[in-house]
Every structure is written in structure tokens, then in C-alpha cells.
Amino acid sequence: MSNNCKYYKQARYVSYDNGTTWYTTGEYRKGELYEYDSLDCIPYLTQYLTFVAEADNMSVALSYANSNVFEYSVDDGSTWSSLTNGQSTTSVNSGETIMFKASGLTISSSDGIGTLNPSVYASVQGNIMSLVYGDNFTGQTTISDYQFRYLFSSCLNIISVENLILPATTLGMYCYQHMFSNLTRITTAPELPATTLASGCYRSMFYNCSSLTVAPSLPATTLADNSYGYMFQNCSRLTSITCLATDISATNCTQNWVSGVAASGTFIKASGMNNWTTGNNGIPTNWAVQDA
């Protein structure tokens, strides 16, 4: 590898299935030169879960974590400190970062592993798997039941998650339920690459994300019970959904999933899939329909 790296206006794509399917990570560069191994050069897929401060004096509070212990770094991973329930990290200033890792955490069916809440506006990026596998997160694609339930829910200072990597392809039940609910400032969702779903895996995941305009592409062809229920409810600015499902027979799999989205938009479906209904449980009323 060269001693530095350079990105132009191309988008970066990654594959989780040896090149069969590709997903954008949301990385775009304008041509600036970055020092090799700086955070700007590290692909998000291989970056610890990271909060980027958009204002001075940002700390991140951990709550609903029970006895779980997280670790965080404010010096790009050179040193790490422990963070327990009810504590906040050291503060950093605008443009600086706080990285997180954890392993062996206890998962609560009501609270997941806990909630991470920044004190000022912040973007969240990097690989979520550093909260499951610690330093060994790269290449990991399995998460457990309830793993990230409520992880960022109602954390109103989170303004961007588009560069957050959720690489799991083996999902647990309700693993992402309410993960981003009530994040009223995010506009673009992270990619969701899984093609095999688990019960309730995305239920209410983006509930009340009222600024969301770009939904993740949904590649799974067979839905699981409750898997998409309430997923985009009250996403009032959402105008485009791509869903490639061909079997939507599972119990409550699309219950109220598009209730409260924008009055007009475009729904992209699998070619030949004609079993969709119109309304809150199917294709939004008055939306245009296209085949993928």
C-alpha cells in the first residue's frame, strides 16, 4: 500500500458475499490528500464505532446498560478507558472523535446492550460490530437477539448515521428494534445487507425519523414475522423505498410499516411481485410503483 491515499468523487462500495452483491458505504471524497492510516483513510468497515463531534464539548453518555462495561478512546485508539452505566466519556471538541468497543456484553430483552447518547450534535460512523467483538470485529457478520435494541433511540443530537456500517447477515430476533427511533435529524439510513431475516429484526427501526428521505434498500426476498413492522412509521419525508420481497406472508411482517410516510413517492419492487396491497401495510397510497 502507498504511503498515503487519495479519494476522488467516486462512491466506495463493499461486498459481504464475495462480490455477488455490492453496497455503497456512503464514502465520497473530493480529491484531497490524506495521510496514510489517518481516520480519513480508514474504510468505515474497518473503523471502530465512532462518534464525530459536530460541536465543542462532546461527551457520550451510556445508559440502560445494566452491568455492561464499554471501552472508549479519544486518541484514535492509542489508549482506552472503561465506561459503565450512568457514566459519560471525556469531552472532545468539534471535529474530534470518540471510538467505542466492547465484547461479551449481557443483552437485555428490554434494553439491548445499552444506549449511547452524545451531549452535542454528532455523526456516527464505523463498524457497529466493535460493540460485539471488541478488537476482532472486522469480518464479523453475526448478531444476537435484541443486540442493538434501542442503541441510539431518542438520542436527538445524532444528526447522521449514513456512514455507520451494519454488516450483519445473520440476524437475531428484534436485533435492531427501535435502534434509530425518534432520531429526527438523520436524513439517510445505513445499508442493511441481510437477505435472511429474523422475527422482528427491523421492527420500528426508523420509527419517527421525521427527516429521513433515503431508506436503505431491502434485499430480502422472504420476510419473517414482524420483521418490517412499523419500520418507517412517521417518516414523514420519506419518498423512496426499494423492497425486493416476494414472500410477504409472515405474520405482521409489514404491519403499519409505511404509516405516515410522505404523501407521494416511489416504491421499487421485485419484478413479477404482484401481492402487495396498498396502504399502511403495503405500498404507500398514491406512490408510483416501479420494478427493480
Predicted region positions:
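Enriched but not universal
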Residues: M1-E54, M58-A61, V289-A292
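Solvent-exposed loop and capping/linker segments of extracellular ligand-binding repeat ectodomains
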Residues: C41-A292
